[in-house]
A protein has these predicted regions:
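Extreme N-terminal starter segment of soluble prokaryotic enzymes
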Residues: 1-4
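Conserved N-terminal Rossmann-fold NAD(P)-binding element of oxidoreductases
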Residues: 6-8
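Residues in the short beta-alpha loop(s) of Rossmann-like NAD(P)-binding domains
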Residues: 10, 32-36, 103
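Short N-terminal binding/cap micro-motifs at the start of the first secondary-structure element
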Residues: 12-16, 37-40
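A short, Lys/Arg-enriched amphipathic alpha-helix followed by its capping loop at the start of a domain
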Residues: 16-26
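N-terminal beta-loop-helix "entrance" segment that forms/cooperates
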Residues: 29-53, 108-109
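Structural motif corresponding to alpha-helix initiation and N-cap regions
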Residues: 56-57
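Glycine/small-residue-rich loop that forms an oxyanion/phosphate-binding "nest" at active or ligand-binding sites
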Residues: 60-109
Length: 109
């Protein structure tokens, strides 16, 4: 059984959580920083949801306690602070870190 934690701050993150929730031998915990994000994730069957901002210490505690196989960072591309905290907490706990990035878009004008 793979235990995954997905920080789902984008629509791609929610799509990933939905897809993972349908896979065999996969348990998913989805983290959102806001109540609204949590409500969207709670619509996906079989997913544990955390709808609150986690600081680095809280992330470390969660990763240790749950023993995730992987942590997926699907936060917004410009959310560098949270990405840094997730990376550090993963490194400190020996948890595999994966980053899901959307393609950059160009703005003309």
């Amino acid at each position: 059984m793979y235990k995954l934690c997905v920080f789902a701050g984008t629509s791609e993150g929610r799509e990933l959580v939905g897809w993972l929730s349908c896979q065999k031998n996969v348990s998913v915990t989805a983290c959102a920083a806001t109540e609204y994000g949590g409500e969207l994730l709670e619509e996906i069957p079989g997913v544990r949801v955390s709808a609150r901002r986690l600081d680095e210490d809280q992330m470390r505690e969660l990763f240790w306690k749950e023993g995730f196989s992987y942590v997926v960072d699907a936060t917004h591309p410009y959310a560098r602070s949270i990405t840094g905290s997730i990376e550090t907490a993963c490194r400190d706990t020996g948890t595999e870190y994966l980053r899901l990035l959307r393609d950059a878009s160009e703005v003309s004008g």
